[in-house]
Amino acid sequence: MVEGIPKRWKVLSGQNKWKGLLDPLDPDLRRYIIHYGEMSQVGYDAFNWDRKSRYAGDCYYSKNRLLARTGFLKANPFRYKVTKYIYATASIKLPISFIVKSLSKDASRVQTNWMGYIAVATDQGKAMLGRRDIVVAWRGTLQPYEWANDFDFPLEPAISVFPVTDPKDNPRIGSGWLDIYTASDSRSPYDTTSAQEQVQGELKRLLELYKDEEISITFTGHSLGAVMSVLSAADLVYGKKNNININLQKKQVPITVFAFGSPRIGDHNFKNVVDSLQPLNILRIVNVPDVAPHYPLLLYSEIGEVLEINTLNSTYLKRSLNFRNYHNLEIYLHGMAGMQDTDGVFKLEIGRDISLVNKGLDALKDEYLVPSTWRCLANKGMLQMDDGTWKLDVHRRDHDDDVDADDNDDSSTSNQLQELNTD
């Protein structure tokens, strides 16, 4: 069901702002959006959320093994190679769900978290996608209702990212969003530069490397990751850093954002800046019962085009008063696979495994016989020592200098939940 994507990728990436594709939802666009949502889901599946681990806030896997270990490659025609990890820090106090801090005194990262990755389509992926696609996938947060209550989201001038000539037009962005994107820590061995600098530096390298090919840059993320996707994409286009020179002529690389469950980011001036940027196309996917896209409530403006889904219509899901469920990315992707049009009908149009819904939730109806929160490391990361005792010491077992590692070899996915040794 991907035959049309290589020929239609420009339209699917928003060249015409998705006019005529959203209601009813175009079949190719449905698969296309799910693909980028799954690339964002990799960030959740690879992230160490356990604050009892001294490696909390890190990624379990190396770049070479990330896509295979998270199961992304199985039966997936879209192939990518991960080229860089993104790390972020914070200089202000943020909710724990933003920057996860280990409770261990021996923690490897006190203020630094793994925030996502950059990947480029392989030759095989290029054939299936119609061009050399560069993806910036940002990791999100699991507990939006915690930060909605605990974080007051003051607006802050974003002149450092979007300088304007008239102070009255100065865009303002939520201070938490801006801090995660622009803060740096010179003491960190992982992100002495800011997430902003890391992303722009790697994209500059990749654009130069593939400048003689047809290229696109696609940003994707969920929740906090959706915010970072919009912010980093707008920053790139605003600074004209998506321009490449070919034979003394400038060429603009198209930029697309697929933002799942994104909170609001900035004020009306920020919206005006984003709306003026070309070629920048933003599609926000919003689940009707999810409250996160409506926060913060005051002084913030919504941006981009909107595709609404409603997972309350799914016949596979339990009815729940737990609003956290409706924000979950796997719930979003389930909704994308089955949504029809505005008449409220729900029918799975793509054979996306419904068991993925229960990966981190208890949301599927019991009749489907899928255990709740089934995805976890073997023994929850507890490793047995030589003396017979057990210790929580989960970290990456595969290293980036492992020349035999191949992220396009999906044979290793059967071992993706094995213990992660530290050596």
Curated annotation (Swiss-Prot):
Coiled coil recorded as keyword: yes
Coiled-coil ranges per UniProt: 194-217
Gene Ontology terms: cellular component: cytoplasm
Alphabetic keyword roster: Coiled coil, Cytoplasm, Hydrolase, Lipid degradation, Lipid metabolism
Any Pfam family the entry gives: Lipase_3
InterPro entries linked to this entry: AB_hydrolase_fold, Fungal_lipase-type, PLA
Lineage of source species: Eukaryota, Viridiplantae, Streptophyta, Embryophyta, Tracheophyta
Biased composition (Acidic residues): 401-410
Family: Belongs to the AB hydrolase superfamily. Lipase family.
Protein's recorded name: Phospholipase A1-IIalpha
Biased composition (Polar residues): 411-423
Taxonomic source organism: Arabidopsis thaliana
UniProt-annotated stretches for the region Disordered: 399-423
Listed EC numbers: 3.1.1.-
Residues the record marks as active site: 223, 290, 327
Class of this enzyme: hydrolase
GO molecular function, one term: phospholipase A1 activity
GO biological process: lipid catabolic process
UniProt cross-references to PANTHER family, sorted A to Z: PHOSPHOLIPASE A1-IIALPHA (PTHR31828:SF14), PHOSPHOLIPASE A1-IIGAMMA (PTHR31828)
Annotated compartments: Cytoplasm
Function noted in UniProt: Acylhydrolase that catalyzes the hydrolysis of phospholipids at the sn-1 position.
Keyword Lipid metabolism: yes
